Each structure stands twice: as C-alpha cells, then as structure tokens.
Amino acid sequence: MTSTEAAGTGKAPAIRANPALQTYYESQESYLVYEVVLRGSHHFGFYEKDTYWPFPVGRSLERMEAKLLSALALPSGSQILDAGCGFGPVAISMAKKGMRVTAIDIIDHHVTKARRNVEKAGLPKGQVTVEKMDYQHLESIASESHDDAKAAATGFFRILKPGGRIAFFEAQRSRTSGDYDEGDELAGHLKLVNEYTAMPTNELSREDYFKDLLEDAGFVDVEFTLPPGTREPREHWSYSALKA
C-alpha cells in the first residue's frame, strides 16, 4: 500500500469537496498574502510583548514554529503529521530539528510547491513526505503512526499512538457574528471573512470550544495557554493534549 492509497482499498484517499477553501487558496489574493508576505507560511507570527512593528515577518513566523514544536514536547526522531501544510515551511522547520514529518494538504499547487521546497532544503530522503490528503479523511494513515472539526479531531486521535500529543495555535473568539444584532455591519464583515476565506470555526470557536472538541474525541490533559507575547489576549490560544 502506498501513502496515497486508502488503507485496505488501494484507492486514493478521500478528499471532501470544499469549494470555498479551494477557491480561496487558488486566488491571487491568497498568493499575495501567503507567498509574498508570509513567505509560504499559513499561520500567525509570534511577537514579544509590546511589539508594534511586525517586520521582518519571517522572524515572528519562525518563533511561532519554535513555540509549536515546544508544545509538542517530543524527542528527536518522533513522527509528526503536519495537517494543512501549505508550502511546507513548518514541516521543514521541524525536520531540521530532527523530526520525521508527514505533510498533507488538499490544494494541488500547495503539494507541488511543498515537495519542491522539501527537495531544496536538502533534507535526508524520506524525512519529510508530502501527500495530497484531507485531514478530515485520514484513513490512509495507519493507526498509531502519528471543516468538520469533530471528524478531524477524531481522526487525529485515531492515528496517534498512546502517549502521542496534538498541539496547535488557534483563535478563540470572544464574540462571533451571532452575538451582534441582525444587520450589524461588523457581523456582516465577520460572515464575509468566514465565507470567503474558508474559516468556519470563526463561527464556533467560543470559550472552551476547542477544549470540548479535544475531550470529546478522547484526548486527556487538555491544556490551553495564552502565549505571553500575544497582543490580543482574548483571541489567540495555544492548545495541547495527550492520547492516554
């Protein structure tokens, strides 16, 4: 069985149709933001307290990647799944720290560019593998090998070995569009952001949303902390949890 075949079927892994997400990440706007401004990354930067000038952006992105790896608390040589890898900078960063990484994405040009970037990085063969795969359909990844959020959390739990850890940084909203009066201008803007940038959890991620999501999937010791350098104290949180 190859890594691009669903377990036991010989078929390519299932990709859930998501026109909004695919359209956004294939747009010129997406290219300008992620390729030009964020050097291929698809995540927030980490800024020290009282930082008001965000440039150069690359350093803040590297700091956030280091924070993520620290939250995983894994020894060198561990197997990591980078779900939604974009152009591969996080996978490459972790591989340079000695990790073995399976990087997945559903956008064709992301997969192509990530493979190219891995090759350019000069990493040992097989240390990073890049596949087109949907993190809501992880059937092709064997159990204990490492924008239906519930399905994704359940899938992550299944493939982790006992004692394995999940870690991510996510936005936890103090208010969503549903908290505003009908017709409110800000509510309308929030809905547009959610719809056209494929960010449906913006409508769901109230207090304890991600904690409950992880616990319902079976994770234990769920921790959530505000990174000390974050400038929006009610928005961005670090989450980590264990598979018992």
Swiss-Prot record:
Q: Which cofactor does it need?
A: S-adenosyl-L-methionine
The biological pathway it contributes to is: Mycotoxin biosynthesis
Q: Provide the alphabetized UniProt keywords.
A: Transferase
Check the record and name the InterPro entries matching this protein: Erg6_SMT_methyltransf (IPR050447), Methyltransf_25 (IPR041698), SAM-dependent_MTases_sf (IPR029063)
Query: Do you know which SUPFAM superfamilies this protein is assigned to?
Result: S-adenosyl-L-methionine-dependent methyltransferases
One Gene Ontology MF term: cyclase activity
Question: What EC number(s) does the entry state?
Answer: 2.1.-.-
Summary of the function given for this chain in its UniProt record: S-adenosyl-l-methionine-dependent Diels-Alderase; part of the gene cluster that mediates the biosynthesis of ilicicolin H, a 4-hydroxy-2-pyridonealkaloid that has potent and broad antifungal activities by inhibiting the mitochondrial respiration chain. IliD catalyzes the Diels-Alder reaction that converts the acyclic 2-pyridone intermediate to 8-epi-ilicicolin H. The biosynthesis of ilicicolin H starts with formation of the tetramic acid by the hybrid PKS-NRPS synthetase iliA with the partnering trans-enoyl reductase iliB since iliA lacks a designated enoylreductase (ER) domain.
Family statement: Belongs to the class I-like SAM-binding methyltransferase superfamily. Erg6/SMT family.
UniProt protein name: S-adenosyl-L-methionine-dependent Diels-Alderase iliD
What gene is this protein a product of?
A: iliD
